[in-house]
């Protein structure tokens, strides 16, 4: 039963793929070990017209069916990145539950009962992909089938469940709210031009999101654009905090000076009454000194805590390697992969819905041991 559900969910996942490509992949999955290994090699060498996400997903499915297929670095990196925020204790607990689940129904119930987050589900997928021999075929097939079902449900426009495109729209809405708040702060902090630029960017993203709603094609590129805008919002927030420090000093120094000090200042600078001159009195000097000491102590404590956290993340949790990978990805992005995805998406849009569906809908044969055969 799990095999048949896997085929159905795989076909649903590949619904935007060209019919001949979808048929070739399904035939390979149902054609036994050798056919699956050949298809996995074609996917790894990018000889099939698949998006980056589609290719890695299909390779994961094939390796979980047949552990003899060697892991693909691109798929492993994707899984590592998806589970990087997961705690080790959560990972251990998930592995125990997986081994006790037994089959597809148990795995699916486990995901639903525990209301697993995306990173927890990806931890399960990573386990059966990295260590397939540690789990029974039922658990491996059940895990990837339940994972595909989750992906397919999120890609559809359900009213009860927010789709991935809907989540993207919500993120853009949050960014727009943040940019509006920054625009209001701009009156005090002098960030008006930056706030207006940010608002224009978020409006453009909102329009783009509306055009691509319900589509899996451009979502990764939208996510990257949103992260860029979120980074701008964060930077503007930090600038606003710096202006807050200036405002604290200004609130201290803006107290009325005594008549004696004002006269002294006017005599010293030989100014007329038309020029406003501020001289610090003794109380204001004490307040400025205390404010400077307080801000200095807070800054030093913050830096000390930050250094300790970074050391723990680096030496104990081993996150430095992942950060280096993220920096490398930012500095040297996969331009070729992005261009390939965009070109393929245009080709699919040009093809339209009039293309004949050549999917082989004949009954799927099985051997006595439950393995697919032609």
Curated annotation (Swiss-Prot):
GO terms classed as biological process = monoatomic ion transmembrane transport
Which positions does the site annotation Cleavage cover?
A: 259-260
Q: Which residues lie on this side of the membrane: Cytoplasmic?
A: 1-242, 310-374
Which ranges make up the Extracellular topological domains here?
A: 263-288
Respond yes or no to whether keyword Transport is given for this record: yes
Superkingdom of the source species: Viruses
- Which positions carry Phosphoserine? 337, 362
Quote the residue positions with lipidation, kind S-palmitoyl cysteine.
324
The entry's comment on post-translational modification says:
Palmitoylated.
**TM segment ranges:** 243-262, 289-309
- Gene Ontology CC annotation, any one: host cell endoplasmic reticulum membrane
Record: glycosylation sites: 270
Q: Which family does it belong to?
A: Belongs to the influenza C protein M1 family.
Quote the function comment for this protein: Ion channel, which might have a role in genome packaging and uncoating processes.
Subunit composition? Homodimer; disulfide-linked. Homotetramer; disulfide-linked.
Identification of the protein by name: Polyprotein p42
Gene, per the UniProt record = M
């Amino acid at each position: 039963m799990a095999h048949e559900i896997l085929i159905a969910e795989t076909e649903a996942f590949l619904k935007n793929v060209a019919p001949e490509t979808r048929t070739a992949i399904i035939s390979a999955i149902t054609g036994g070990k050798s056919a699956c290994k050949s298809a996995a090699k074609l996917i790894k060498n990018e000889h099939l017209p698949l998006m980056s996400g589609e290719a890695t997903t299909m390779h994961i499915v094939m390796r979980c069916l047949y552990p003899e297929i060697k892991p693909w670095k691109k798929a492993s990196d994707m899984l590592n990145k998806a589970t990087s925020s997961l705690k080790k204790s959560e990972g251990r607990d998930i592995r125990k539950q997986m081994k006790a689940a037994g089959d597809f129904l148990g795995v699916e119930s486990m995901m639903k009962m525990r209301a697993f987050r995306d990173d927890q589900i990806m931890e399960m997928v990573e386990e059966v992909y990295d260590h397939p021999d540690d789990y029974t075929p039922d658990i491996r097939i059940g895990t990837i089938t339940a994972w595909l079902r989750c992906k397919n449900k999120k890609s559809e426009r359900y009213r009860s469940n927010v789709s991935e495109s809907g989540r993207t729209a919500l993120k853009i809405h949050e960014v727009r709210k943040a940019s509006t708040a920054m625009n209001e702060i701009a009156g005090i902090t002098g960030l008006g031009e930056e706030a207006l630029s940010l608002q224009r960017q978020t409006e453009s993203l909102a329009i783009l999101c509306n055009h691509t709603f319900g589509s899996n094609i451009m979502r990764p590129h939208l996510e990257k654009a949103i992260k860029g805008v979120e980074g701008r919002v964060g930077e503007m927030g930090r600038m606003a905090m710096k202006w807050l420090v200036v405002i604290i000093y200004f609130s201290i120094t803006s107290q009325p000076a005594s008549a004696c000090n004002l006269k002294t200042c006017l005599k010293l600078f030989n100014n007329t009454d038309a020029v406003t001159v501020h001289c610090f009195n003794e109380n204001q000097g004490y307040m400025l000194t205390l404010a400077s000491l307080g801000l200095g102590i807070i800054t030093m404590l913050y830096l000390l805590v930050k250094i300790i956290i970074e050391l723990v993340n680096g030496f104990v949790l081993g996150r430095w390697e992942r950060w280096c990978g993220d920096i490398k990805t930012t500095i040297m992005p996969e331009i070729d992969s992005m261009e390939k995805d965009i070109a393929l998406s245009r080709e699919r849009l040009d093809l339209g819905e009039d293309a004949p569906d050549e999917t082989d809908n004949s009954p799927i044969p099985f051997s006595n041991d439950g393995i697919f055969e032609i």
